[in-house]
Amino acid sequence: MRRLALASLMALVVGCGLISSDVAEIKFNLPPRMYSFDSASFGVPAGISGEVPCGAGQIVTDCCNPPPPLPAPDCSANALTCEQNENGMNVCMAQANVSQSQTMNLGQDVQQLSGLTGLVSISIKRISYEVTVNTLDVDVPEVFLYLAPSGVTDPGDPSAKKFGTLPAISAMTTPAGDVVLESNSASVLESFTSNIQSPFTFIAATTLKVSHSPTGRIDMTITGQLAAKP
């Protein structure tokens, strides 16, 4: 009877907020992951050093097959299309799909979690980003973050799940802020971290459309704060 009364008293104390209900939480920093997008790897066809007007009434009507003596760009990797630029002019545009992946294993990478085994509940406090270097001479559109099983590096893989989004980044700027998380980000994270010792992949991806061969690179670091409950 005494034990029952004590248990009831403890439940009442917790319910009244005198003892935090998250006292068993282990808060920890998400191990930082750095992503570097270098213009040298974008695969933009050579020969578009500047904007090339295209379309009806222009010398170039097909961006991949300009008339001689203009040099023919290599469109085998990333085709050129005739599209409007920010000034409303039709110019030859190249689309570059850029992505990088990093492996993460919370059980090994986070010291506070090294002793945990079995099923663990991981919750998100915040996920943030910082651009540490940006010498790119073109704007970077939204960068999408995905979580995927270990070994998966393609954001287009059916097993890769969208997790969050970084806002567009202007050329030559180094912003920082919070990642905009997907509405189901908690369940996405849980699906890859319920077994704390299982590695998974963290992917960053974006699609650039450029009217000239870009130069420079951008380095971004993703970090944040999570919490674990055994």
Language-model regions: role of each:
Residues 25-44:
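Post-signal peptide N-terminal segment of mature Sec-exported envelope proteins
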Residues 118-136, 220:
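A short beta-strand element within beta-rich, extracytoplasmic domains
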Residues 38-73:
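Post-signal-peptide N-terminal segment of Sec-exported extracytoplasmic proteins
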Residues 137-154:
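Short, surface-exposed beta-strand/strand-loop-strand elements in extracellular ectodomains
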Residues 91-118:
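Short beta-strands within extracellular/lumenal beta-sheet-rich domains
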Residues 130-142, 210-214:
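Extended, low-complexity, turn-rich repeat/linker tracts enriched in Gly/Pro/Ser/Thr and Asp/Glu
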Residues 167-223:
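Cysteine-clustered segments with highest specificity for TGF-beta superfamily mature ligands
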